[in-house]
Amino acid sequence: MATGPRYKVPMRRRREVRTDYHQRLRLLKSGKPRLVARVSNAHVRAQLVTPGSDGDETHAAASSEELGEYGWDAPTGNLPSAYLTGYLAGARAVDAGLDEAVLDIGLNTATPGNKTFAVQEGAIDAGLEIPHNDDVLADWSRTRGEHIAAYAEQLDEPLYSGDFDAADLPEHFDDVLATIQEDHE
């Protein structure tokens, strides 16, 4: 490890590859709440947070693990579940009195049509005003999971083990979305 007066150790969360402080400062300067979208292969999480003196304050949050309460039987790490998680977080934020936000994608790459932007699209459809470019949002057919259903129909054996049939994903998506909308009217 380098030593001496000219060597500067990066901040701990930057060394752990967890925080981009330059991006965080730009988002905080906007003065708007942040829609923090974090995705993994298994789950999706969305939170609306504002900076506070003792750390960020969370006003509304949703996880794809909660979608089971609304009847979601499909896996929770795909694009349709990311949209539904964003919609659920956006609906909770609107219920909490928030009406605008900026998207915080963290260290994720801004690839058009990915799950992070599906979270944003869900929050926008729930009633939040988030500045965005429509080119980064996925097609509605992809958001509903029609690409997953088409792939499942090509297979000889079921795509997922268990009771859920992936070929029915678009209809299942519509049913769960309607349930969430009824719950947050």
Curated annotation (Swiss-Prot):
GO annotation, cellular component aspect: cytosolic large ribosomal subunit
One of the GO BP terms on file: translation
UniProt entry tagged with the keyword RNA-binding: yes
One Pfam family of this chain: Ribosomal_L5e
SUPFAM superfamilies reported in the protein's UniProt record: Translational machinery components
Coiled-coil intervals: none
Signal sequence annotation: none
CDD domains for this protein: Ribosomal_L18_L5e
GO molecular function: 5S rRNA binding; structural constituent of ribosome
Keywords per UniProt: Ribonucleoprotein, Ribosomal protein, RNA-binding, rRNA-binding
Subunit description: Part of the 50S ribosomal subunit. Contacts the 5S and 23S rRNAs.
Protein family membership: Belongs to the universal ribosomal protein uL18 family.
Functional summary from the UniProt entry: This is one of the proteins that bind and probably mediate the attachment of the 5S RNA into the large ribosomal subunit, where it forms part of the central protuberance.
Name this protein carries in UniProt: Large ribosomal subunit protein uL18
Organism of provenance: Halorubrum lacusprofundi (strain ATCC 49239 / DSM 5036 / JCM 8891 / ACAM 34)
